[in-house]
Structures are given as structure tokens and as C-alpha cells.
Amino acid sequence: MGGKTGAIAAFLLVIVLFVAAVLLWSERGQMAGKNVNATEECSDSAVIVIDPGHGGFDGGASASDGTAEKDINLQISMQLKKVMEEYPVKVIMTRQEDVALNPSEGNIRSMKRQDLQQRRRIIDEVQPDLAVSIHLNNYKADASVYGAQVFYPKGEQKRTDMERCEQTSKNFAEAVQKSLEINISDGRERTAMEKNDILIFENPTCPMILVECGFLSNQNELNKLKMAEYQRKLAYAIWEGIDEILCLEKGEKMKIIDSANR
């Protein structure tokens, strides 16, 4: 009788341990899904650089109707700034108007490089929690291609600090990509990708991402990209992804700084 009772007790103990393990696994899965493999702790405030791509003499890509990438980049960036103003975020804009950053005389290629170097200089000086560059894509070889995609830097050097920046950049990029997929709902599934052929990504000193918000070469997407409401939707989706990592709550507004005119 004692042996039988002991066997029953052992069996019940196994059942209890199994249920506990299942519950623990489920809880961990929910937590992992919340922050897209992020290792960062939630913050009380943040510093973010918003970098509207191109500007001034550099129009970036252009649509068939003449729409310049630089203009939509700025419009989306300003919408993103408005969203961030509702949170404890100190925002530094690389530009808030149609200007290039400190171009000097020279050929176009040289001037573009100087512009990018100045943007990167601002980011390096500020050392934000995140720098996000806003751009648009263009693929005239296939006008059916559409959808937003997020990129993050891949460094060639193996420094511990750089690896940490790259991992955090990847976390932000994956969170923003997922948010775009959920909030834009355009039927296009994309994966955040690493990229090492962008000057502004070279040897990162802080977390950085670049968001290609859509394709100017796709007529349907172009029509949406020119609409203020869609730009607001994109900005909201980008911020939702960023805040998935930062976990900020709406609160006291912080100052917006325009680095191009400071």
C-alpha cells in the first residue's frame, strides 16, 4: 500500500513539474516576442537623431512625375518628429528644410560625400540612443516592386563596442520592420537586412537604422507616399517599432533640435 501511494505521489509530482515548465516556457516566449530579442532595458527617456535623406542640391531618387525623394523623406521625418514629441524623447534633426549639409564647391559626388560625412558627424557627436535615416527606394527595372524595408549596419571590425551597436541596431531594425508589416498591412513581408555599403553606416558608434519607406517607381505606392495621411501612418509605424525597444510612455515633451541650423 505504501509503495502504491508513493508511486501515485511521484506521478502527481511529475505532472505538477510538467505544468510549471509549460507555463514558464509560455511566459518566456511572450517576453521574447515583445522586444524582438532585445537585450536593452526599458528607458525613462531617449535621444534620437532623425536624418531625412538627401536635400538641397541632392534630390535623391525621382519618380516618373518628377516627385523628388528628398521632399517626401523630409515630410515623413517631420511626421515622425511630431509623433516623438508626445514622448520623453530629445529629437535632433539633421535638417528641417530643403538644404544640404555644409556642401562646398566641387563635383556632385564630392558634395554628396561631404553631406553624408556631416550627417554622420552630427550622429557621432550626439551619441543618441538611435539614429534613424529616412529614405525612399526606386527600381525602374520592375515597377511592380513595392514595400518598406529596414536596414542596419554590419561592421567588418570586431570591436566589442561596435558589435554591441550592431546588435542593438539589429534589434531596432527588426522591431521597426515588424511594426511596418503590422501597421501598414500592404501584403508585403520583408526582413530587416544588414548592409555595409552605406557611408553613414561605416564603423558605427551608436545604434543606427535606415528605413526605405517605399518605392517611387511603383505608381500605387507613389500615390500613397505623397499623401500626408499615409506619411503619418508610416511615421507612427516606425515609432511603434522603435518604442517596442525603448518602452517609453507619453509624458513631458522635450526639445527638438535642428542640427542644420544650430
Indicate where each model-derived feature is located.
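Active-site-proximal helix/loop segments of hydrolytic enzymes
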Residues: 2-12, 19-30, 35-43, 74-262
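Short glycine-rich His-centered loop
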Residues: 45-66
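Periplasmic OmpA-like peptidoglycan-binding domain that tethers envelope proteins to the cell wall
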Residues: 63-71, 220-221
